[in-house]
Amino acid sequence: PLLVSCRWHERRAAGLLNRGIALGYAVPGSVIAVGILIPVTRLDHAIAALWQSLGQPHPGLLLTGGLAALVYGYLVRFLSVAVQTVDTGLSRITVSMDEAARSLGRGRGALLREVHLPLLRGSLASAALLVFVDTMKELPATLVMRPFNFDTLATQVYTLAADERLAEASTAALAIVAVGVLPLILLSRHIAQGTQPQDG
């Protein structure tokens, strides 16, 4: 919806948005993690202080002690991947399509639901696959921001390899490769089917 809104108002706004979002993918994951943890930790303590001022027991660190901060870090880190993929699909939807739908009495909500979403279905699926693969193998941000007793495949490989338990680490490493390759195979098949010439 954000990209569509920029498309409706001004293409320059979409360009500025893309450049701003791209910073998250350009900056190392560990830097993003530290930059997020500092304000989020302060917010955590402020929430706890407010909760205690109401006569309630200390709730703990709700954001940094759970998955909320980690998910937010992934959002900052990989939003650029999703936005670029969807923006590529959105560029194939011409303005004349929007004008034709509006001439038939469709408002912006109906235009988004009945025209844009069906045409962007492939781009949305591709964006989800790419973000999934990138998130699965992300290590620096996960190591810094993960809560206690929470591991991903990437952190498990790192921990086992650091302990020189290479045989055990290989299982998780192969799982990362397998899970990462399968979506890419599906994505390449989808792209190949979309580029095949139509008969007749």
Language model features by range: what are they?
Residues 23, 27, 76, 83-86, ...:
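Transmembrane alpha-helices
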Residues 136, 142-185:
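Interhelical loop and adjacent transmembrane-helix boundary motif
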Residues 20-23, 72, 125, 129, ...:
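Hydrophobic residues within alpha-helical transmembrane segments
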Residues 21-37:
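Hydrophobic alpha-helical membrane-insertion segments
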Residues 5, 87-98, 102, 106-114, ...:
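C-terminal transmembrane helix and the adjacent membrane-cytosol boundary/short C-terminal tail
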Residues 9-17, 33-75, 109, 145-148:
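Membrane-interfacial helix termini and adjacent extracytoplasmic/periplasmic loops
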Residues 61-102, 127-128:
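Membrane-cytosol interface at the C-terminal ends of specific transmembrane alpha-helices
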Residues 1-6, 27:
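Transmembrane alpha-helix signature in integral membrane proteins
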